[in-house]
Every structure is written in structure tokens, then in C-alpha cells.
Amino acid sequence: PYPTKVEMNNIYKAALRAPDHAWLRPTSFIEIKDKGIEKLSKIFEEFASKNVDQKNIDKYKNAPYRAPMIIAAVNTYKEHPKVPKIEQMLSTAASVQNILLALNALKYSSIWRTGKIAFNKFVDKKLGLEPNQTIIGFIYVGKNKGKQKNIPKINSREFVKYL
């Protein structure tokens, strides 16, 4: 199962509270579920048939079926004298983190997928994006069916310096 419309509305509200210098609103989303998963699978398969080894095509084709819902996070670059492209992309990335946190709070499992399949103009175009738009990643959403992956503990002191 995936989140309800009401839950998703709240999740998107949380996402859109991400830092956004000059209120440019560079972030949008494509919600993919049900028949959309099949469409995305075909797009991934078409991309793979032209860009990866033959033995890996099925991996790309089957990837969307790993979750009942996928959210494509889209960044729309808007030229601005004080807000460079990287800041706008970071705003969209922060919105993805907000989505992951909101999903976790609602007891959904999620993973942020990137790589070749996310960072290419072929998939962007197939999803109807404009030239100034790019996918920041795909968020796979569902309920965990088994034991949750054990994430190693981190000693935060190893990552902090004090001035």
C-alpha cells in the first residue's frame, strides 16, 4: 500500500517547506502509481535498451515494480541574479529529504533513487519535462514487507569540527 491522497497532500506540504531562496518555487513532483508504474517501466526499458548492456535491461525494466508508488522530484531552473542553479537544485533536494522524513513519520518505507536512470535527458523528455527541468531523483514509496534494513550506527563526533 501507498499513502492516501490526504497523506500525500500533507507530505507535499512538508516537502514544499524546504528552503527556497527568493521563493522561486523550483520544485515539483510527478506521482507515479498503478498504471503509471507500467508506463515508467517501459520508459526505463527503452532507456536501458540504448544505454546499458543487454544483460541489465531487465533490471531497469523491473525497477519501478519494487514499490507501489514512485515520486519523481523535478527541479525547474529559473534564472535569477541572486539564486544560482545549484541553490535551486539544493532546494529540490531538501524537499526530497522532507518527503522521506514525512513518509517515515507516517510509517511508510522509502528510498531515494538516483543514478543513470534519474540523471538523463531521455527520461526527462519521456516524462514531459521542459529543457530547464531535470529529475533530482525517484522516491520509491511503500510499506516494508520484511525486516527493515539495519543501518550502521554513526558516531557524530567523527563528522564534526569545532571552531
Regions found by a protein language model. Give the residues of each.
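Generic preference for hydrophobic
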Residues: 29-31, 71, 159
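Short, charged/polar surface micro-motifs in flexible loops or helix N-caps
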Residues: 34-39, 45-46, 77-79, 121, ...
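Small-aliphatic-rich amphipathic alpha-helix that forms the alpha element of a beta-alpha
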Residues: 15, 71, 77-125
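N-terminal amphipathic, basic helical "cap/leader" segment at the start of enzyme domains
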Residues: 1-66, 163
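Conserved hydrophobic/aromatic beta-strand scaffold that supports enzyme active sites
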Residues: 70-74, 138-140
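C-terminal helix-cap and adjacent tail motif
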Residues: 135-163
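Short, electropositive alpha-helical surface patch
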Residues: 123-136
